[in-house]
Amino acid sequence: MENQKLQIQINSNKLLKELEVQEFTDDIVQSLIIAMSRTQFELLNLDDTCQLIKNEFRFLSLREVRKAITKGTAGEYGRSYKLSTQEVCYWIQQYVKDKNAKTLKL
């Protein structure tokens, strides 16, 4: 009986984690679609870009990733001549750099 309860709890936790990952991916895709609209460039590899963002910037919250993409599309990190995985990652890196600089000043 205890083993069964434990197994149910483990399965529930796995399912929750999978849902969180899917929600994170869906929100990043939505942000990238908005970025395409704002920059009027097409990003050809949405799935690969999402996966890279999740892997490389896992220390950031979804809110921070979305904020970085929004600032990037607004030109806060310079002009964009294309929309690529490299460009989006550059925006996020600049966001992290700015965030760390503000933290160090406090």
Residue ranges of model-derived segments:
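Charged interaction scaffolds used for protein-protein
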Residues: M1-L106
